[in-house]
């Protein structure tokens, strides 16, 4: 086979993140080095899928050979292992893009999280996905020769690197289409220059690949001399999702997940279903155990692999899964879509919408099943994906109740920041006369659990849901009730707990309110339009004053969320509530001098605003008032 260098050779530097990845991978993934073969075979399989799809509209791309497969050979004397495919191949720009850079958003942030702890780094790198670069775990140099299907033989490209700071790329001739990856093995990688070792790894990781994976085997005669070799197919070469569920082992499902997701860890769970009827399709859906590093990034690629009648059509078909389930991996194989379907056609396609609805219900059912049978397992899911699942309340009205049932929060029922309380369990513990689900949103768990707004609830033994994720205030604008019970924010002015008080308490409060009427009026006169209203409150115990908002006015946390997103937030007008039974309020009430009275108001309002917002518009005014009061 005459393959030779032509010209146009250049040396290029790796993107800085590639250099960092290569270094970390070699040192962090060494204990799991055999995964390099899984990654390279998986890439070869993808290249074959893409050729098969493109050849549907241009059969000439097969160049007279439609038998797709992966071939693996080794040379002990030359110390090389070669993985070859006859798939779609790559052009010069493809090679630079795919082998010289990492085209993922948030890459720099990902690398900043890496440490020198090999076990932790290997888990993080597994979430990132390494693909081709895993070759450097076992090789100290890698050569790639590739030609795009349909291109002239002298339009092939050779890429070479020793895994350091740069690589070379040049034009070469290549007789066959597709890609050859030649690994120049390290001493530690020589164990893979063995027929039995290669068969072992392929059987373990790549049995499910839908195209043949073959090894060049050399037989020996009776005298021990090598005879002419032959290609021996090692894997089953049957697409896993087309097989009967009862014939598939859990280990096979787990390895297939790693093929479609490029994750290193086993999935949390999966669901394999063949559906016949109005729509004929097969789905294989996986829920990962760990979130990918860039899941919250807007440019994060998500979606399922789409096959039509077992022919690969596209990766990342996001039309079959709503955004709030973007962590789901897997595939869908439809008999009802056309092979030439495009992303634009999928968007408004009735079949697509039907499959999307079915897949969504399937995933939510999987989650309900885990939550019911294995609480610890579900909480591990929630820790990874809970914030994303919450988005579903705004996106998916049809499944709103199911999503609400899957939510988990902290609450005053448990002295822990762990979000482990379901709304159903809260409702079960509600007091006899309680008809609302009480909740509090805050910046953090510490701020929530120490909020003065909780004092009355603690004294009455009423449980409050504690919410401290950034999106929770926004979330509650879509979650208004659960199981027939309305939600009630405990920082809103409309809060009424009178049903939990006896008549004597109510009468005493009425008398005290009347006594403090003049104090309320003086306070309002001093503050003017800085607050919406001043009034007494009896919901506090150890706190002198708080601020609350009207029921239909934007809350503090929502205003903070908008500001953090760079959006203009309307000014929040607070209601200032004072506790007439607190010593400081009584001291303020006894102050006859209006100037001194004003200092008391400034200090107490400042304290209330700090407790609510964590900041003040004018700290100097608060500090001046406090210093003067302390120096008396």
Curated annotation (Swiss-Prot):
Main location: cytoplasm
UniProt cross-references to InterPro entries, sorted A to Z: HATPase_C_sf (IPR036890), Heat_shock_protein_90_CS (IPR019805), HSP90_C (IPR037196), Hsp90_fam (IPR001404), Hsp90_N (IPR020575), Ribosomal_Su5_D2-typ_SF (IPR020568)
Matching CDD domains: HATPase_Hsp90-like (cd16927)
Subcellular localization, as worded in the UniProt entry: Cytoplasm
GO cellular component: cytoplasm
Keyword field: ATP-binding, Chaperone, Cytoplasm, Nucleotide-binding, Stress response
Region A, annotated ranges: 1-343
C, as annotated region: 561-632
Region B, residue ranges: 344-560
Coiled coil: none
GO molecular function: ATP binding; ATP hydrolysis activity; ATP-dependent protein folding chaperone; unfolded protein binding
PROSITE patterns the UniProt entry points to: HSP90
Job description of the protein: Molecular chaperone. Has ATPase activity.
Self-association state and partner proteins as the record states: Homodimer.
Family: Belongs to the heat shock protein 90 family.
Protein name: Chaperone protein HtpG
Chain's gene name: htpG
């Amino acid at each position: 086979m005459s393959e030779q260098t032509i010209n146009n050779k250049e040396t290029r530097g790796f993107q800085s993140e590639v250099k960092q990845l290569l270094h970390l991978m070699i040192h962090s993934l060494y204990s799991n080095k055999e995964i390099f073969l899984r990654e390279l075979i998986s890439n070869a399989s993808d290249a074959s899928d893409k050729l098969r799809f493109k050849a549907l509209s241009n059969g000439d791309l097969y160049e007279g050979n439609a038998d797709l497969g992966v071939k693996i050979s080794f040379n002990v004397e030359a110390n090389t292992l070669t993985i070859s495919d006859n798939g779609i191949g790559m052009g010069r720009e493809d090679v630079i893009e795919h082998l010289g850079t990492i085209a993922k958003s948030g890459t720099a942030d990902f690398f900043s999280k890496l440490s020198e702890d090999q076990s932790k780094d290997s888990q993080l790198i597994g979430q990132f996905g390494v693909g081709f670069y895993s070759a450097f775990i076992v090789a100290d140099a890698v050569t790639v020769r590739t030609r795009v299907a349909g291109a002239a033989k002298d339009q092939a490209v050779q890429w070479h690197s020793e895994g350091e700071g740069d690589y070379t790329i040049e034009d070469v001739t290549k007789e066959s289409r597709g890609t050859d990856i030649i690994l120049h093995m390290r001493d530690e990688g020589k164990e893979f220059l063995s027929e039995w070792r290669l068969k072992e790894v392929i059987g373990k990781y790549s049995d499910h690949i839908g195209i043949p994976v073959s090894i060049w085997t050399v037989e020996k005669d009776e005298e021990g001399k090598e005879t002419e070799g032959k290609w021996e197919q090692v894997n089953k070469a049957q697409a896993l999702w087309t097989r009967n569920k009862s014939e598939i082992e859990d280990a096979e499902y787990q390895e297939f997940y790693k093929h479609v997701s490029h994750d290193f860890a086993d999935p949390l769970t999966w669901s394999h279903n063949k559906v016949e009827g109005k729509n004929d399709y097969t789905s294989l859906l996986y829920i990962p155990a760990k979130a990918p590093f860039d899941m919250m990034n807007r440019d994060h690629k998500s979606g399922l692999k789409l096959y039509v009648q077992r022919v690969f059509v596209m990766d990342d078909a996001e039309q079959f899964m709503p955004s709030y389930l973007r962590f789901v991996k897997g595939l869908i194989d439809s008999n009802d879509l056309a092979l030439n379907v495009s992303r634009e056609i999928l968007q408004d396609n009735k079949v697509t919408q039907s499959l999307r609805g079915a897949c969504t219900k399937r995933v939510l059912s999987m989650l309900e099943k885990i939550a019911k049978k294995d609480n610890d397992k579900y909480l591990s899911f929630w820790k990874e994906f809970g914030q994303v699942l919450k988005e579903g309340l705004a996106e998916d009205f049809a499944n709103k109740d199911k999503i609400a049932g899957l939510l988990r929060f902290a609450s005053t029922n448990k002295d822990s920041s762990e979000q482990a309380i379901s709304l159903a369990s809260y409702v079960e513990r509600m007091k006899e006369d309680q008809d609302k689900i009480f909740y509090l949103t805050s910046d953090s768990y510490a701020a929530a659990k120490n909020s003065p707004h909780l004092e009355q609830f603690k004294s009455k033994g009423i449980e409050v849901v504690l919410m401290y994720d950034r999106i929770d205030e926004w979330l509650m604008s879509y979650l208004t009730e659960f199981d027939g019970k309305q939600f009630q924010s405990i920082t809103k002015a409309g809060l009424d707990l009178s049903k939990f008080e006896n008549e004597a308490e109510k009468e005493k409060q009425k008398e005290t309110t009347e006594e403090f009427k003049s104090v309320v009026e003086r306070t309002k006169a001093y503050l003017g339009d800085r607050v919406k209203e001043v009034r007494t409150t009896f919901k506090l115990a150890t706190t002198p004053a708080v601020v609350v908002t009207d029921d239909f006015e934007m809350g503090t946390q929502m205003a903070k969320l908008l500001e953090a997103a760079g959006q203009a937030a309307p000014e929040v007008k607070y209601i200032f509530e004072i506790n007439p039974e607190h010593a400081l309020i009584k001291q303020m009430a006894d102050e006859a001098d209006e100037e001194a009275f004003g200092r008391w108001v400034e200090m107490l309002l400042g304290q209330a605003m700090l407790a609510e917002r964590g900041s003040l518009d004018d700290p100097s005014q608060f500090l001046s008032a406090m210093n003067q009061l302390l120096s008396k």
